[in-house]
From Swiss-Prot:
Zn(2+) binds at residues 143, 146, 156, 159. Gene3D superfamilies: HUPs (3.40.50.620), Isoleucyl-tRNA Synthetase, Domain 1 (1.10.730.10), Methionyl-tRNA synthetase, Zn-domain (2.20.28.20), Nucleic acid-binding proteins (2.40.50.140). Belongs to the class-I aminoacyl-tRNA synthetase family. MetG type 1 subfamily. Is required not only for elongation of protein synthesis but also for the initiation of all mRNA translation through initiator tRNA(fMet) aminoacylation. One of its GO terms (biological process) is methionyl-tRNA aminoacylation. This is Methionine--tRNA ligase. Residues 556-568, 577-594 have a biased composition (Low complexity). The keyword tRNA-binding applies. It comes from Myxococcus xanthus (strain DK1622). Its cofactor is Zn(2+). It comes from the Bacteria.
Length: 703
């Protein structure tokens, strides 16, 4: 039997809405699963709400709800958000389910049979008023490290230090405010320390986890692995431990078992497997891949494999770990209004924008990802809207108009055929990049393919050719449509709804990576008419992007990261502030001297034209310069050297609409003749915006 792949994302906690930081992981995983399916692989994708534990019990009580009612509300909300974000699980379940209880009890029983469960007396905080032990979140007090007040019993939200509930200063019960007492209780521990050799072998397996994380995990072995407390005293929202009185499984025992329970539920409902054991038995021919954030590596790489191994289950084959999401270079924060719920994003913007931006910045490492809102807008507009979208719109609009939606047969030779064949030759690069989670590399190749096709159209100029020889124009546009079809297939894992629109406009069946194996020119069935073209995605406007952040009253709007001086650059000391009256009268320090008024005739000499950037590259030995190839409607594009390299990556400019000073005398910069200038606005350096004339034809005069 061929190997099957089972993929999971970490379980979202049913204690609140999903935010765009959570979305990084689910989008990353969904892209991978869609890619595997496109390649014809046998893959299933599971997730569930993590529903047990103290925070849920506490917050449900605050809202006057039973925990079951509380988690049901967020379960429905999470499912809706995932669907609208285009994340498609084979099954999304809950850890508060009969299947999860079944497997939690089964696994616990096997751990107990193997002698891996030990009873120990531990000291805990206890509220005599409420007659209950107080887990971390049921106790508050002063942080023993930074002395911040009103902190929970597990970690300080101000300094970030972790501690035991018994370490809190002036501790009190979070429910009633009564100072707790200390009391002994018998708890159950999983003997993780017995499995160090096994876990060392697991960490040494190639591909199991990122090498840097494997090295980091060695620190736990140097200190000696600690046995794991898997029980909590009642009352507690979770599963009662069989054979025990008033003891419950700690959430970190039953939460990962939710992966197995979800497989079981899916098997029951679909009949596609006899049970979860078809995938999870120790001898199953299954590749199990967990996608997680870097904050839960310990549980998934050490505790979880040890538990599975003792219980006779299949251990994870690979653990894919990602970093956290930053917003404009800073940690997201509720108090600053930057902890953006997924729903707030979806109320404003298409999910394709966010999925594309995440993919364009994700690799297989664990570095944090920065959602800089300015960069987000520029990259999406430059690469997705103006490059990929523009190619499809240019080709299909002409085909649908004067050429009556009919494609030309494939050509025996010529630049159009060479364009398509060159694009097909790059498919293995994209496939390999997706397979290795090098999404940003895949996106780079995809945008290069689109740029080449736009350049081909610019040279062929079918909008002019159609008046001279309609069949030549039809052939050129059909070859460009072939590339658009290919781009739809390559982008389908990332932006599925955009690809669906593109396939429909082409009048073609969805194209997959599997179908591309051995594919030859022409890709499209040239005997079929195309559909009705329309813009695939509107441009991202600054107002809509900023609207995803709902600021608390009195909070300042978050800004993109300030430009910093280059390393070794000199900076002037800020002069002492002058009296207010003097400041008002004098020009700002460093301001350019005004040239004064000019005559209209002087201004009329300047010719401003709309242009479109076809290609962009860095100028060697010039950190601030970019060499741009710009179409200004003259038959052949111009080369313009522009000092905007600090503000824009070359790949973010391809496809951008720009305003060009078209009648400047050519001049050489770094040995390159520059024939024009782009209009920008801003203080300079990294803080520049390109003036955009809108969706007008290259060469249109700007008045």
């Amino acid at each position: 039997m061929a190997e099957r792949t089972l993929v999971t994302s970490a379980l979202p906690y049913a204690n609140g809405p999903l935010h765009i930081g959570h979305a990084v992981e689910y989008v990353q995983t969904d892209i991978y699963v869609r890619f595997l399916r496109s390649c014809g692989r046998d893959v299933v994708y599971f997730c569930a709400d993590d529903t047990h534990g103290t925070p849920i019990e506490l917050n449900a009580a605050k809202q006057g709800l039973k925990p079951e009612e509380f988690i049901a509300r967020f379960h429905e909300e999470h499912q809706r958000d995932f669907h609208d974000l285009d994340v498609r699980f084979d099954y999304f379940h809950s850890t508060n389910s009969p299947e999860n209880r079944q497997y939690a009890e089964l696994i616990y029983g096997r751990l107990k049979e193997k002698g891996d469960i030990e009873r120990r007396n531990i000291e805990q905080t206890y509220c005599e008023n409420d007659r209950r032990f107080l887990p971390d979140r049921f106790i508050k007090g002063t942080c023993p490290n930074c002395k911040a007040s009103d902190q929970y019993g597990d970690a300080c939200e101000k300094c970030g230090k972790a501690y035991d509930p018994t370490d809190l200063i002036d501790a009190r019960c979070a429910l009633c405010g009564t100072p707790p007492v200390r009391k002994h209780s018998e708890h159950l521990f999983f003997k993780l320390s017995r499995h160090e050799d096994f876990l060392q072998d697991v960490l040494r397996k190639p591909g199991f986890i990122h090498p840097g994380l494997a090295t980091q995990l060695q620190g736990f072995f140097e200190k000696g692995l600690s046995d794991w407390d898997i029980s909590r005293d009642g009352p507690y929202f979770g599963f009662a431990i069989p054979g025990e009185t008033d003891k419950y499984f700690y959430v970190w025992l039953d939460a990962p078992i939710g992966y197995i329970a979800t497989t079981e539920k899916w098997a029951k409902e679909t009949g596609k497997a006899k049970s979860a054991l078809d995938y999870w038995s120790a001898d199953a021919d299954t590749r199990i891949i967990h996608f997680i954030g870097k904050d839960i590596v310990y549980f998934h790489a050490l505790f979880w494999p040890a538990v599975l191994n003792v219980a006779g289950f299949h251990i994870p084959s690979e653990i894919k770990v990602h970093g956290h999401l930053m917003l404009n270079g800073e940690k997201m924060s509720k108090t600053r209004g930057t902890m953006v719920p997924v729903r707030d994003y979806l109320d404003q913007l298409d999910p394709s924008y966010l999925r594309y931006f995440y993919a364009a910045n994700l690799g297989p490492g664990v570095e944090d990802l920065d959602l800089n809102l300015k960069d987000f807008r520029q990259r999406v507009n430059g690469e997705l809207v103006n490059n990929v979208g523009n190619l499809a719109n240019r080709a299909l609009s002409l085909l649908a108009g004067p050429l009556e939606k009919r494609l030309a047969p494939g050509r025996a030779e010529g630049p159009g055929r060479e364009l398509v064949e060159a694009a097909l030759a790059r498919v293995p690069e994209v496939r390999d990049a997706f397979d290795k989670l090098e999404y940003r590399s895949a996106i780079r190749v995809i945008t290069e393919i689109a740029s080449a096709a736009n350049g081909f159209l610019q040279t062929a100029a079918p909008w002019a050719q159609v008046k001279k020889d309609a069949e030549v124009a039809r052939a050129d546009l059909s070859d460009a449509a072939d590339v658009a079809y290919l781009l739809g297939a390559l982008l389908a894992p990332v932006t599925p709804r955009l690809s669906e629109k593109l396939f429909a406009q082409l009048g073609a069946e969805p194209l997959t990576f599997q179908a591309l194996e051995g594919a030859k020119y022409p890709l499209l069935d040239r005997s079929r008419p195309i559909g009705t073209p329309e813009p695939l995605l509107p441009r991202l406007e600054e107002e809509r992007v900023n609207a995803i952040i709902k600021l608390p009253e009195g909070a300042a709007a978050p800004q993109a990261a300030e430009a910093r001086p280059a390393k070794g650059a000199k900076t002037e000391k800020k002069p002492a502030e002058a009296p207010a009256a003097t400041q008002a009268a004098a020009p700002s320090a460093g301001a350019a001297e005004s040239p004064g008024e000019i005559e209209y005739d002087d201004f009329a000499k300047v010719v401003l034209k709309a242009g479109k950037v076809l290609a962009a590259e860095k100028v060697q030995k010039a950190d601030k310069l970019l060499k741009l190839t710009v179409d200004v409607g003259e038959g052949s594009p111009r080369t313009i050297v522009s000092g905007i390299a600090e503000a824009f990556a070359p790949e973010a400019l391809t496809g951008r609409n720009v305003v060009v000073v078209a009648n400047l005398k050519p001049r050489k910069l770094k040995g390159i003749e520059s024939r024009g200038m782009l209009l920008t606005a801003g203080p300079g350096g990294k803080e520049l915006s390109l003036l955009d004339p809108g969706d007008v034809a290259p060469g249109s005069e700007v008045k």
